[in-house]
C-alpha cells in the first residue's frame, strides 16, 4: 500500500524556531480527551493490526499552575507500555515524564535547561540522569502537543528542540503542506521530520486540534499507520 508519504514533499521554506513559552504557542488549543488509536502495518497488499494506543489527556491544576496531564498506554501485546507526562499548559514546558515498559523504567524531572531522573531495567538499580542543556527543551514524547498548539496553516514551518533520553537534545521540524478530509474532519496535513530521511505525515483537525492520523515508513516496504478510532 502506498501511503501519503509517497505523495507529500516537505518544502524547503524557512522555519521559525519555537521554544517553551513562545508567544505563538497556545496550550488552550489542547482539550481534555480520551482517544483510542489503531496501529496497523501495511506491507504491499497485506495489512496487520499490531496493537492499540489509548491516549488520555486531562487538564488539571498543580497548585496555581494549569497543566496538561497525559497518560498514553500502548499495547502491542500482553505487556503494555505506559507513558505519563505533565506539561505546563501556559508555556508547553515539560515538568515530569514517567515511562514504564516490560524492559525499562524512565523517570524525568524538567526545570528549564536542567533534566534530572533515572533510567534502567525495571528489576535492577537504575542509572541517574542529571544534565544541564544548552537551551530549555520540550519533551520528545509530547511532540504532537507542541505541533497541535502552534498556529498551523498552509506554508507554515517550525523547528523545535526536544530532550530524548537516548540521544539527548534533538531538533524536530514541521511543514504544513495543505489540508485534507480525514475521518470526516477537515485537517491540516503536516510533514513531521525527526531527522534526515526520517519523516511522518501527520493529520491534525483544524477545529478540534485532535491528532487524527500518522503515517510513518518504518522500512522501504512497510508503512505504519496510527489512526484515531471514531466512537
Model-found features: residue ranges?
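C-terminal segment of classical bacterial N-terminal signal peptides
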Residues: 1-5
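Residue-level detector of alpha-helical hydrophobic segments embedded in or interacting with membranes
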Residues: 6-9, 146
